[in-house]
Curated annotation (Swiss-Prot):
Organism: Xenopus tropicalis
GO terms, molecular function: zinc ion transmembrane transporter activity
GO BP annotations, alphabetical order: neural tube formation; neuron projection extension; zinc ion import across plasma membrane
Tissue spec: Highly expressed in brain.
Pfam families: EF-hand_Zip (PF21116), Zip (PF02535), ZIP4_domain (PF18292)
Gene from which this protein is expressed: slc39a12
Motif residue range(s): XEXPHE-motif: 595-600
Name of this chain's protein: Zinc transporter ZIP12
Entry similarity comment: Belongs to the ZIP transporter (TC 2.A.5) family.
Residue ranges, compositional bias (Basic and acidic residues): 526-535
Renumbered residue ranges of the record's region Disordered: 516-535
Length: 706
């Protein structure tokens, strides 16, 4: 007796707790403006089971699956009805289909896989349990791929909107939700269940979508498309707000202009405008603008409009730009002509008048600006890291002991320098100078997947320019390798391009290594430093020529000046970023470091290629890196004047293009080696890596956040 009372005492609060949750869920469903409950399928089963006065143990997988099969295979019994029902699925068979043991707990991943199988069962209930089809013996991948291939004319890797419409239509009929008044649209479902609908549903998103559909179906909630008014609604709304039917008068237009001017402060919106409820009937009872509806697929049963829905009551709905365009035109991403703009203007005015869309927000709390100590401390550490990164080019010294390997590795980094220098100028500096490198924040909605090309369209056009440069480089290089003989190539280089070969590159690494000298046969020199006579390969190097090679060539000076300006500008950018916030400064440091390391490594290779010793090249690289500190402190003190930065970027871009395309690229074409095809591969590898690095930086640098 005591145990029975104790059990009853324990059950009463549990019963009332779940009962209260169920009542709250039902009360939320009565308001069509609120999204459904965010609980998953398991939570829905617990709620339904507790409403019947029983308790479901979470660790009993067999009981959970049995209850789920009962609710799915017998939809009439969801709320306690006991109509006769034939079940063909067994709990152990269902668990076997998704690869789960009976003793295992049912977690979210398992319930989502089970939802996929049950959704397939709903779509193929007539054939699922027949002995002919043998569908009960398939594995999970079969059911998943079958749902993705629901329509033969659609992409088999994604579940399109049309296929989702088919699933919703069948599910609505299967669970007999046609007469239910409580419905939620796909947009509300995404918000409530954290479903991202920016792209089509793939095999990763499908299990979550299947769980949501089953959850809402068991809760007697139907899912429809987001409802849109027809094109005439917006004009009719404006006229109705002035109590006009067909004509507006001058005072009405003056009042309209005044309303538009006051929309900056929505709190001052007139009560009359707020109280206007659209009672404008839809033409031909058309509530939804299904401009993209395919012929032969009638889903009118899903979007069945009841008598009270003949009027558009969602006056203050916020429509995205693409949704507004879709209301009027078939292609929401097509350009809008002047005539089409006349049609869409009332919709824009409607959104302004009703203050439907809240001000754009980045969703983050603005932090307090960094203190002076933080700005100078963090920024100094960041530039120090950049300086250390720029010194990585010194690693090329280890290859100077073997002339042939040194030559090959050097050409790899020369190609990397050409790719990073030209890529930095074309993909980063020039767009920034022209003002097209700004970060544009787009709203997230169902068409967001198309933004990837539109947002970075200028980058793909610039990549076309780079493709032209690379294509002609390949033609010239292959012509040199396949057609020109080594002797002709040497004569061409000495006579036309004034590139001298077989001159030594001394690697003075210390007093003990002065005897170990290596010569570079791929030396870049300016016209003033070169003799116009052809130098035979067997000709010994004279001391005068050796001393002359120790001088600093014009190319080395240009690289020093260009790098100094670039690092100076980088320092100003970092100073400006840390003046804004610590997070922005760290993100900018990471972004600059991504292209600074390969850039400086390539520059170090070119400095060695001009005939400088390793020590001098290292010193010049270090001196150019120090200018970042000057730019940093000037940027911190002057808040990095954007006008000054733009001019620095413009001059730097010109220098980078000249260095990479005029001085360095011709050398890559005519350099000779004993292994020409291996060098050709390394040169291409360096070029492509440099361009790819700067392309990825241009696309994703604004997404680096901390």
């Amino acid at each position: 007796m005591f145990k029975w009372k104790k059990s009853l005492f324990w059950r009463i609060p549990v019963f009332f707790t779940f009962g209260a949750l169920f009542v709250c869920a039902e009360s939320r469903h009565k308001d069509n403006k609120q999204p459904p409950s965010q609980g998953g399928l398991l939570q829905a089963l617990y709620s339904l089971n507790s409403a019947n006065g029983t308790f479901l143990h979470k660790n009993n997988s067999t009981d959970i699956i049995s209850l789920l099969l009962e609710k799915v295979e017998c939809p009439k019994n969801v709320h306690g009805k006991q109509d006769p029902c034939t079940q063909c699925l067994r709990p152990d068979a269902l668990l076997f289909m998704v690869g789960i043991n009976k003793s295992s707990d049912i977690d979210d991943d398992a319930i989502q896989k089970i939802s996929v199988v049950l959704l397939f069962y709903i779509m193929n209930q007539k054939d699922f349990c027949t002995s002919i089809s043998n569908l009960t013996k398939m594995d999970y991948k079969f059911y998943r791929n079958s749902l993705l291939k629901l329509r033969k004319d659609e992409d088999c890797h994604y579940l399109s909107l049309n296929e989702i419409d088919d699933i919703l239509s069948v599910s609505k009929q299967y669970f007999q939700l046609l007469e239910e008044k409580q419905c939620t649209d796909v947009i509300s479902m995404e918000d409530a269940f954290a479903m991202v609908g920016s792209t089509a549903v793939d095999e990763i998103k499908l299990p979550r979508l299947a769980e949501i559909i089953l959850t809402l179906s068991l809760q007697r909630v139907c899912i429809t498309r987001k409802q849109f008014p027809n094109a005439e609604f917006f004009t009719d709304f404006i006229f109705q707000s002035f109590n006009r039917t067909n004509d507006l008068y001058a005072p009405d237009i003056a009042e309209l202009i005044g309303e538009l001017k006051a929309t900056g402060d929505c709190s001052k919106l007139s009560n009359r405008r707020k109280s206007v409820r659209s009672v404008i009937p839809q033409k031909d009872n058309e509530l939804l603008s299904n401009t993209n509806e395919e012929k032969g697929h009638d889903h009118s049963d899903i979007y069945e409009v009841e008598a009270h829905s003949r009027y558009w009551h969602q006056t203050h709905s916020c429509f995205s730009v693409y949704e507004l365009v879709k209301v009027f035109f078939k292609n929401s991403h097509s350009p809008v002509s002047k005539e089409q703009f006349k049609q869409i203007s009332p919709a824009i005015i409607h959104q302004l008048l009703t203050c439907s869309c809240p001000p754009a927000s980045n969703g983050t709390t603005r932090l307090a600006p960094p203190t002076t100590l933080e700005k100078y401390g963090y920024s100094t550490i960041s530039v120090l890291l950049l300086t250390i990164g720029s010194m990585f080019g010194a690693t090329l010294i280890i290859f100077s002991s073997c002339e042939e390997n040194y030559k090959l590795i050097l050409q790899l980094f020369v190609g990397l320098a050409v790719g990073t220098l030209s890529g930095d100028a074309l993909l980063h500096l020039i767009p920034q100078v022209l003002g097209v490198h700004e970060v544009v924040t787009h709203e997230h909605h169902m068409q967001q997947g198309d933004y990837i090309f539109e947002e970075n369209e200028y980058l793909w056009k610039i990549m076309g320019m780079i493709g032209g440069i690379y294509g002609f480089f390949l033609i010239n290089k292959l012509f040199f390798l396949l057609v020109s003989s080594p002797k002709q190539g040497l004569s061409l280089m000495n006579g036309h391009l004034t590139h001298s070969h077989d001159l030594p590159l001394d690697a003075h690494l210390g007093d003990q290594s002065r005897k170990a000298k290596s010569s570079s046969t791929i030396q870049l020199r300016s016209p003033d430093d070169c003799e116009h006579s052809e130098v035979p390969e067997t000709l010994p190097v004279r001391p005068k020529a050796r001393r002359k090679s120790k001088g600093i060539s014009l190319l080395a000076i240009m690289i020093l000046v260009g790098d100094s300006l670039h690092n100076f500008a980088d320092g100003m950018v970092i100073g400006s970023a840390f003046s804004s916030s610590t997070e922005t400064g760290i993100a900018s440091t990471v972004a600059i470091l991504c292209h600074e390391i390969p850039h400086e490594m390539g520059d170090f290779a070119v400095l060695l290629n001009t005939g400088l010793s390793a020590k001098i090249a290292f010193l010049m690289n270090f001196i150019s890196a120090l200018t970042a500190f000057a730019g940093l402190y000037i940027g911190l003190s002057l808040s990095a004047n954007p006008d000054v930065q733009i001019w620095i970027f413009a001059v730097t871009a010109g220098m980078f293009l000249y260095l990479s395309l005029v001085e360095m690229l011709p050398e890559m074409i005519h350099v000779q080696t004993q292994r020409p095809w291996l060098m050709f591969f390394l040169q291409n590898l360096g070029l492509l890596l440099g361009w790819l690095c700067l392309l990825l930086l241009a696309i994703y640098e604004h997404k680096i956040q901390f």
